[in-house]
Amino acid sequence: MFNISHKLTSKLPFQIRYIQQCPPPKYDTGCTYCNPPSEMEENLKSPPESIRNTIPPLNRLIFHRSGNKDHDNWPKKVEVFDIMRNISKFGRGNGNMICMSSLSPINEMTTNDQQNVDFAIYPDAQTISINGNDSTELEKLFKIINSNDSNNSISLSKHFRASKIDKTIVLICGHTQRDIRCGVLGKIIHKEFEEVLKRENLENDVELGYISHVGGHVYAGNLVILKPNGKMFWYGMVRPHHVQGLVDQSIKSDDLIEELSRQ
């Protein structure tokens, strides 16, 4: 787990265009102005002047496409799962953030194989299928990753079954057992994304799911937008009324909204 008690500077390797404020919503989906229960509002942090530079300095984001949709019951520490414990053993440190997602495996062989698992790696925007119980393979994977910083894209297809990611991915922190604030907010943000993506005819172009702890539950409403070009947009303190602006600026375009940015 990353310690983000003080502000840190991201090592993300690409240029990003900024806009200062999130555009207001153009329509009400029925979820746009939903709020968490009033008793939870008291426990949510008031927006500070800025939440910039509150993600850790990243080399790579690596997340398991677990297919486990029951994010409310993910254990507080996902390392309880063998695959997460194994991958964390070899991958922790060196600026790697390792998480679990609710996204389903993309390889049929992986889906039907109890040993092979799918991981997505950014900013390389690649998915690999790997034997999560094979320490030799895991060690080999992280030797490659750790010998190349995020400014240097790596070609994993030379060593593993790998494929480029061709869709935008939106992952919302909904790790309820880690922090109830993220569990509750994550659900209403997820619902609004579903409605907006449908209205904008983007549901086939964007994968939407949940991700485990990414640091900074104090900024509940955390999410990351991952683009096929490798760009990553880290946001915090998101509410449903921000979603249309995020879709317009960071999914349809490559702009980062500064008031919600954690990078």
Please describe what each predicted stretch is:
Residues F2-Q263:
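Histidine/cysteine-enriched polar flanking segments
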